[in-house]
């Protein structure tokens, strides 16, 4: 049976790849998992779907996670990987879910400081935009996946020696000017929803081309689940990338 992915080594970091490197689109997919959990079957299936349906070469790095590592080490490794993708001269997309979504939003701010080009598109599913969880109280009674207390402690570990409101870990507090066109999904029953809304408002205030899609009555990272609403979300992803 032919595998749906390959595993490569990039400067000591394992990277799963899907599709053909000569594809029209290149997607750097940062997986979620609260910065402590590894890539899972949902991510593998979604990356495979992206590669098959969108003429895309998809890379999903196994980046260093808390508590043994923090954001600084991951940013260094992902920066080198990103530089190699710029050289492919394809339609370049940063994509991620949950913590991975928060990472790429912070990363898009970071690369401006080192004069790297922005991607062509940014797409996130339920991004964690404020690891300080400063907009408390959060209503986590309706969220079947996430809880405030645990996330707050994980955020401190991921930040390492940084303040939890540093833009490298909490993109809500960073400079979003000149950010690439951005598509964001969130369910209105997840605890990240109100922080994501604040982030979207900040993008709009800075004239960033942003589209925010709310899943009514839905939950965290709903576009990655096998539900009808996820099919609609995928059509929006395809539209963002292909048009």
Task: Map each language-model feature to its residues.
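Alpha/beta-hydrolase superfamily serine-hydrolase fold, recognizing
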Residues: 5, 10-18, 22-243
């Amino acid at each position: 049976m032919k595998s749906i992915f390959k595993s490569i080594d990039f400067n000591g970091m394992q990277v799963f790849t899907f599709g053909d490197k000569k594809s029209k689109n290149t997607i750097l997919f940062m997986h979620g998992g609260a910065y402590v959990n590894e890539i899972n079957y949902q991510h593998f299936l979604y990356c495979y779907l992206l590669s098959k349906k969108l003429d895309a070469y998809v890379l999903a790095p196994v980046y260093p996670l808390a508590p043994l590592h923090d954001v600084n080490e991951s940013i260094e490794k992902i920066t080198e990987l990103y530089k190699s993708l710029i050289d492919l001269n394809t339609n370049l997309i940063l994509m991620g879910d949950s913590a991975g979504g928060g990472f790429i939003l912070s990363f898009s701010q970071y690369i401006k400081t080192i004069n790297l080009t922005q991607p062509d598109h940014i797409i996130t599913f339920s991004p964690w935009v404020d690891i300080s969880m400063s907009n408390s109280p959060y209503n986590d009674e309706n969220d079947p996946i996430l809880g405030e207390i645990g996330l707050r402690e994980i955020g401190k570990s991921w930040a390492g020696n940084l303040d939890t409101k540093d833009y490298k870990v909490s993109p809500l507090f960073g400079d979003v000017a000149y950010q690439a066109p951005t598509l964001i999904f969130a369910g209105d029953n997840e605890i990240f929803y109100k922080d994501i809304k604040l982030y979207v408002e900040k993008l709009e205030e800075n004239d960033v081309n942003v589209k925010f899609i709310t899943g009514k009555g839905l939950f965290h990272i709903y576009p990655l689940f096998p539900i009808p609403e996820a099919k609609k979300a995928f059509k929006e992803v395809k539209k963002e990338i292909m048009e």
